[in-house]
Amino acid sequence: MFKITREEIEWGGRTLVLETGKIARQADGAVLATYGDTTVLATVVGERKPKPGLDFFPLTVNYQEKTYAAGKIPGGFFKREGRPSEKETLVSRLIDRPIRPLFIKGFKNETQVIATVVSHDMENDPDIVAMIAVSAALTISGLPFLGPIGAARVGYIGGEYKLNPMIDEMPESALDLVVAGTADAVMMVESEAKELSEDIMLGAVMFGHKEFQPVIDMIIRMAEKCAKEPRAIDVKDNSELVAKVRELAESDVRAAYGLKDKGQRHEALAAAKDKVKSALCNPEDPNAVSETDVGGVFKSIESDVVRNSILDTKSRIDGRDLETVRPIVSEVGVLPRTHGSALFTRGETQALVVATLGTGDDEQFIDALEGTYKENFLLHYNFPPFSVGETGRVGFTGRREVGHGKLAWRALRAVLPPKTEFPYTLRLVSEITESNGSSSMATVCGSSLAMMDAGVPLKRAVAGIAMGLILEGERFAVLSDILGDEDHLGDMDFKVAGTQEGVTSLQMDIKITGINERIMKQALAQAKGGRLHILGEMAKALDTARPEMGEYAPRIEVITVPTDKIREVIGTGGKVIREIVEKTGAKVDISDDGTIKVASSDGESIRKAIAWIQGIVAEPEVGKIYEGTVVKAVDFGAFVNFFGPRDGLVHISQMAPTRVEQVSDVVKEGDKVKVKLLGFDDRGKVRLSMKHVNQETGEEIVYENEPAEQPREKREGGGGRGRRRERD
C-alpha cells in the first residue's frame, strides 16, 4: 500500500531521518523529518495554473506547533490550538526567506507550505528540523524549486563552534545563529550574539554552511529515488513588451532616479508608469497587454537603471557614495509623562521609541512546547501606513512587524542588566513615523536611547545598520544604510546591530541564488564602520544611562526573607499581603525562594511596605524596649501590638510598680505604651512589661531586690504545668 523512501544520516551527534511515501500522499510533496525524537511533517501543494493578475509569487508558509507533540493539552476554554504564537510566526518567516528566491522567475502559481511539529523531545529545537523537512518536500514535489537547501544552528560555547546545540546548552552559548543555503552559497542568516567580533560571526556562518552539506546530499539522494516529474511551467516571452516599455519609459525612469527626494521621485515614477499604461494598455481590447504585465516590466527597467548606475558611477539614488550614512538626529526625553523616550531620525527614516518600566505583575506568560515561562523584556514594533505616505489597515500586527520587533529585541538583549540587579519588567514600543529603509535598525538605535533615558543601566549603547548589495556577474557593490528603493531593487538585505565591542545581532536575506564569503566579509567590515559612526551620533544626545529613573517610573526594592516566613507575610488567604498593599499603596511580589519585590512610584510607600514586612519576619529581642499600641484589654492584662503585626501580653502584675485593681485604671484600647520584652512563656507567647519602662522617657526602670528576669527561648507549645506551680 505504501511506497516508502527513507534516508538516514548521523548529523551533529544525533540521527536525522527523512521519510516520504506514507503520510500525506495527496500533497505534491510530503516529508516526515525526525531529529532525535523531534519530528516535523512538511507538506507542499502548488496550484496547477497561475493566479491571474499577480505581479509576485503567491507563496504562503505556515509553521505550526501541536501541543500533543510535547504531551500537553492546550489551555483556555476551547482546548485546541488557536492563533499562531510569536514563535510560530517567526519560524514561518525563517522557512520562507531562504526558499522564496529559489523558485524560478515568472512562476505565479499559488503555493502553500505547511510544517507541523508532531513530536518534540525537549532537546532539539523543531525550527531546523522544519526547514530541512520543507526543503526535502519541495525538492521531490515537481515544483520549479532550484534547491535543495540545508539549514543548521550554530552555537559558540567555550570559544568553539557547536553544531545544533541542544536546548539546555543554549544558555551557555554566546551565539544563537541559524544559517540556511544551497550547496554553493548562503541564502539566509538569523542570529543573536553576546558582543562577538565580525570574524567570529563570519566564521559561524561558514561553519554552518559547511556542516549542513551532508543534509543537502541526503535530500538529493532521496529526490533521485522518488521525486515527481518536473511540472511544465508556462513562462511568457515578454521580450517584445520589454523593448516597448524601455523605449517609452527608460529616459523618464533615469530622470526620476536623479531626484533625491523620495516623494518627488515616486511621483515622477508614477507619472512615467501611467504614460506607458496609457500607450500600451486597452481594457476594451482582450488582446492588449495587462497593466500587471506592464507593471512587472516597468519594475525590471527601474532595477536595471538603478543597479547599472550604482555599479558604473559608485553613486547612489540620493547622491551618497557607497559607504556614507544618511544624516542622523537623536533626541531623548521627547515625551513628558513617559518613563523614557527617544526620537531617532536617519534621513527619511524615523522611529519614536518609548520605554516603560513595570513590576513582576507585568511580565508576559509564554506558553511554549518546552513549558510555560515568563518574559520580562518586551519590544513591540509598529509600522503604521502613514509612515510611507499611504492609507491602510490599522491595529493588525502582521508577520513583518513581529519579525522586525524580534530582530531589534535580539539586538538589545545582550546589553541588558541582569534581573538580580534590575528587577523591572521592561517594555519598548517603537512607532515608525517615517520609513525609507532600515526601520528595524532605527528601532534598535531609538530603543537603546529610550532605555538610557529611562535610567536602565545598559552595559553599552547599541546601534544597527542595514547593508545592501548590487551583484552583476563579477561586479558588485556593497551599500551602507540602504534606502527603501535600494532594498527593493537590490540583491541583499544585510542587517547588523551591535556595540563598540562587537555584534549582538545579524540578519541576512538574499534575493538571488546566494553570495559568497568574500562579499559577506566586505559587508561586515563596512557595517562595522557604519555602526561605530551611528553610535557616535547617538552619543551626542545621551552617551550613558541616566543615574536616576524618571519621575513617573516605579521604584522597585528587593529584600529577602527566610522561606519559612513566606506564609506569615502572605497570611491566611492572602489577608496580610492584601493589607500591606492596601495600606501602603505599594505592589508586593513574593517568589518561592523568599525574594520579595516591593514596587511603587512613591518612595515612602516602598519604605512603609518594607518596614511592615521586616516587622513580620523579624524576631523581637528579649530585654529590648518597644513602643506599642493597646489592642485589647482583658481582666488579667492588656494585649499590646508592639512589633509590626506581633502582639504580646502585659500581665496586670506588670502594668505598674504598685498593685493594680482594674486594667482599665491604667490603659484602654488605642493607648500608646512603652513595653519591655521579658521573654516567652512555655507556649511561645510573648510576655511584656510596662512597669519596667518609664512611660514618659522610654528609659528602663530597674527595681532593687527584684529577681532578674531569666530570658527563656521561644518555645512552640508544650506543657509546663509544674513550672507554672513553681512561679505561683
From Swiss-Prot:
Q: Where in the cell is it found?
A: Cytoplasm
Boundaries of every S1 motif domain copy: 623-691
What keywords are annotated for this sequence in UniProt?
Cytoplasm, Magnesium, Metal-binding, Nucleotidyltransferase, RNA-binding, Transferase
Q: Does the keyword Magnesium apply?
A: yes
What SUPFAM superfamilies would the database entry show? Answer: Eukaryotic type KH-domain (KH-domain type I), Nucleic acid-binding proteins, Polynucleotide phosphorylase/guanosine pentaphosphate synthase (PNPase/GPSI), domain 3, Ribonuclease PH domain 2-like, Ribosomal protein S5 domain 2-like
KH domain residues: 554-613
| Basic and acidic residues bias spans | 709-718
Residue numbers binding Mg(2+) = 487, 493
**Top-level taxon in the UniProt lineage:** Bacteria
Task: Give the start-end ranges of region Disordered.
Answer: 697-728
Q: Which cofactor does it need?
A: Mg(2+)
Biased amino acid composition, Acidic residues? 697-707
For this protein, what reaction is catalysed? RNA(n+1) + phosphate = RNA(n) + a ribonucleoside 5'-diphosphate
Question: EC number(s)?
Answer: 2.7.7.8
User: What is an example of a Pfam family matching this protein?
Assistant: S1
Which GO cellular component does the record give, naming just one?
cytosol
Which GO BP terms apply?
A: mRNA catabolic process; RNA processing
Q: Which GO terms describe its molecular function?
A: 3'-5'-RNA exonuclease activity; magnesium ion binding; polyribonucleotide nucleotidyltransferase activity; RNA binding
**InterPro entries assigned:** ExoRNase_PH_dom1 (IPR001247), ExoRNase_PH_dom2 (IPR015847), ExoRNase_PH_dom2_sf (IPR036345), KH_dom (IPR004087), KH_dom_type_1 (IPR004088), KH_dom_type_1_sf (IPR036612), NA-bd_OB-fold (IPR012340), PNPase (IPR012162)
Q: Which family does it belong to?
A: Belongs to the polyribonucleotide nucleotidyltransferase family.
User: What task does this protein carry out?
Assistant: Involved in mRNA degradation. Catalyzes the phosphorolysis of single-stranded polyribonucleotides processively in the 3'- to 5'-direction.
UniProt-listed PANTHER family: POLYRIBONUCLEOTIDE NUCLEOTIDYLTRANSFERASE, POLYRIBONUCLEOTIDE NUCLEOTIDYLTRANSFERASE 1, MITOCHONDRIAL
NCBIfam families the UniProt entry points to = polynuc_phos, PRK11824.1
What's the protein here called? Polyribonucleotide nucleotidyltransferase
Q: Which species is this record about?
A: Parvibaculum lavamentivorans (strain DS-1 / DSM 13023 / NCIMB 13966)
The gene coding this protein: pnp
